């Protein structure tokens, strides 16, 4: 394994201080309301977010950031695509934390940006294949949602790992498609996920920020 790949794995690990564990992407509301009740429901919910929601959207944004496209324009687009105040907060807060930590580690000037653009601006210097960066980023995103479900449904740890394993083919597929997708291909149809994120904003009892 190359040092660049090890660095990327470090940046996308749960130990990296982005605070990802505090965000459920609206999943907490879906669980609390009974829309997601078991392992099968969690797997379907996360798969839909990856395929039809912010998973694919962020992957395309990340791919363009990795290729050195206009980072300011990509950041503006990422903010505009956030379907709720909490989703915007989620991508901006994690992106700022990611940029600050990678800047401290690398000595580079890395301004705060929405998360997929922040990852792209930092990871571009590693020289890793675009598809590989997308796969690892999507995996980290899916793993965080599964971890939230393990804590809140609750599920067993083995059930959670089985869900994540079952999502690997989908992650590979989305990464391949997104690596070459034009920016015009961005679009979302994860309506239930977006509504869950909106409704979480007024959820009175919560353990996650989003």
From Swiss-Prot:
Which protein are we looking at? Urease accessory protein UreF
Its Gene Ontology cellular component terms are: cytoplasm
Keywords annotated in UniProt: Chaperone, Cytoplasm, Nickel insertion
Source organism, top-level taxon: Bacteria
GO MF, one annotated term: nickel cation binding
What family does the entry list? Belongs to the UreF family.
What does the protein in this record do? Required for maturation of urease via the functional incorporation of the urease nickel metallocenter.
Disulfide bonds listed in the record: none
Q: How does it assemble?
A: UreD, UreF and UreG form a complex that acts as a GTP-hydrolysis-dependent molecular chaperone, activating the urease apoprotein by helping to assemble the nickel containing metallocenter of UreC. The UreE protein probably delivers the nickel.
Localization, UniProt = Cytoplasm
**HAMAP family the record matches:** UreF (MF_01385)
What InterPro entries has UniProt attached to this entry? UreF, UreF_sf
């Amino acid at each position: 394994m190359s040092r660049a790949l090890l660095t990327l794995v470090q940046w996308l690990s749960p130990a990296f201080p982005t605070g990802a564990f505090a965000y459920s992407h609206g999943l907490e509301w879906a669980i609390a309301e009974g829309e997601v009740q078991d392992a099968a429901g969690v797997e379907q919910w996360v798969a839909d977010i990856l395929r039809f929601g912010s998973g694919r959207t962020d992957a395309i944004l990340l791919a363009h950031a990795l290729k050195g496209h206009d980072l300011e324009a990509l950041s503006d687009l990422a903010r505009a695509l956030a379907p709720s105040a909490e989703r915007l907060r989620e991508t901006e807060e994690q992106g700022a934390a990611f940029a600050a930590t990678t800047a401290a580690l690398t000595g580079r000037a890395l301004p705060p940006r929405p998360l997929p653009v922040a990852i792209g601006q930092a990871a571009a210097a590693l020289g890793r294949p675009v598809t590989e960066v997308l796969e690892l980023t999507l995996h980290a995103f899916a793993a965080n949602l599964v971890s939230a479900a393990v804590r809140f449904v609750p599920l067993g740890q083995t059930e959670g790992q089985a869900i994540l394993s079952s999502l690997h083919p989908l992650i590979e597929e989305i990464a391949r498609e997104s690596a070459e997708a034009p920016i015009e291909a961005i679009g979302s149809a994860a309506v239930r996920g977006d509504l869950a994120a909106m409704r979480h904003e007024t959820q009175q009892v919560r353990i996650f920020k989003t």
